Regions:
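Active-site neighborhoods and metal-handling regions in enzymes and metal-associated proteins
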Residues: 1-140
């Protein structure tokens, strides 16, 4: 969606029909990583620290092999733009910076994305969409 020339995105995994237990575990792991990433972000934090926690948490819950990329990228005139959060990102998060928290996990059979726009605030983030941060299974 674009508003006044600015772009954003919202991503949610949706299953048509019931998920297998393995699928549901991976989708839940993605949601957990996604929400924790937003918890770790606030003004004054070095970007690479968010990335470090993201990958450490992926190791802890056993999904590091399923991470395609992550955890965040800039948001502005294009949906995906600088700055990216990477393990070597030396910049500090500053108030009013905008990021897409973009959690992408995959396995042999499927992939999933959780994505929310955020604004960096002094004590955390303001999410641009908090709707449907839950596992969605539609009848098939």
């Amino acid at each position: 969606a674009r508003v006044a020339g600015y772009s954003s995105s919202v991503g949610r995994p949706v299953s048509i029909g019931p998920m297998t237990p393995a699928m549901k575990r991976l989708v839940q792991a993605g949601l957990d990583m996604h929400l924790k990433t937003m918890d770790w972000m606030k003004a004054g934090i070095k970007a690479k620290e968010v990335v470090k926690k993201f990958y450490e948490y992926g190791d802890k819950i056993g999904v590091s092999k399923n991470i395609l990329y992550g955890p965040c990228h800039g948001l502005g005139m294009m949906e995906v733009e600088r700055p990216w959060m990477e393990s070597r990102s030396e910049y500090f998060l500053e108030e009013n910076m905008t990021f897409q928290v973009d959690t992408f996990l995959y396995c042999e059979d499927f992939g999933l994305r959780w994505e929310n726009g955020t604004i960096i605030r002094k004590d955390g983030v303001e999410t641009l969409s908090s709707k449907l941060n839950e596992i969605i299974e539609l009848e098939g």
